[in-house]
Amino acid sequence: MAVCEAILNICSAPIWDLPKIALSANWMSSFDNEFDKYNLYKTAESITSNICNKLGVTIPVGKDSLSMKMSWSENDKEISVKSPNTLIISAFSSVYNLKNIVKPMFVNDHNTSIVFIDLSGGNYRTGGSALSQVLKTKDTECPKVDNINNFKNFFKATQHLIKNNMILSYHDRSDGGLITTLLECSFAGHVGIDIDFKKDILDINKYMFNEELGVVVQVSNKLLKDVCKIYSDNNIENHVIAKINNTYEINILAEKDTVFTSSLEDLHKTWHKTSYEIQKIRDNAESAENEFNIIGNKKTKGLYIDK
């Protein structure tokens, strides 16, 4: 998952070929017992054999932190805390043209559609997700890469679309799931959207908040059929998930029946609240408050160049 998520992060840039991507791996472990040593070895083996070799990408650089354990004495007791085995992947590549990079922000164009590309094989696994942590559920099944060939086909198809300027915006699904991905693009673009989910989804919360592999792309309606066909021809699941609206609101519908409505400004402030509280303590409190007050305001231009 770490490797594929890193690749999805830079897939919006004109890279053309997967082997052009190189990875940096940061390995972290306490590495003080046979169990952790075995798990670390199996992780490295799986990354190389099951993922990198099949994708044709390399890991030329990286670092390791293999002493992730703290021990101390307290009330005549020996106490220790250690990090679980953790791998952080960063991806990098040269690109053909910076102007072809597709941004993670929706364009305010009503003649467009937002398409969800699902790379999970229809799974809603929520183990380790923000949803499971907030609700304190004991979901043991975590997202994983089910079909590496499908992932390769997705990369190739998406690079073709970028090369031919057929995608207006792009954002990968990650922390917070599909709903957060859609909201972040709306916040960045300052546009409201109508999100339409199917009524036959068995668990709407898991569908919205699972953190499986996937992306959303915004496409001109003139090219919508062509874009969807390219993905479908590569056996990649895709469907229209949202449309731009002119109300500056986020509306969630279940096949046209509205189940949730909120102003974009209110949701943007909620999304930014944690960062704001930290910023108040860390930086100038008055400046932090001034910034927070204009978050999501439709009339705020933000940083711009007056030509």
Can you describe what each PLM-predicted range is?
Residues 212-214:
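Short, solvent-exposed beta-strand edge segments and adjacent coil->beta transition regions
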Residues 1-70:
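A glycine-rich phosphate/pyrophosphate-binding beta-strand-loop-alpha-helix module
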Residues 15, 41-43, 58, 64-209, ...:
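Intein/HINT protein-splicing elements and their conserved insertion hotspots or analogous self-processing inserts
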Residues 216-220:
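Short hydrophobic/aromatic beta-strand micro-patches
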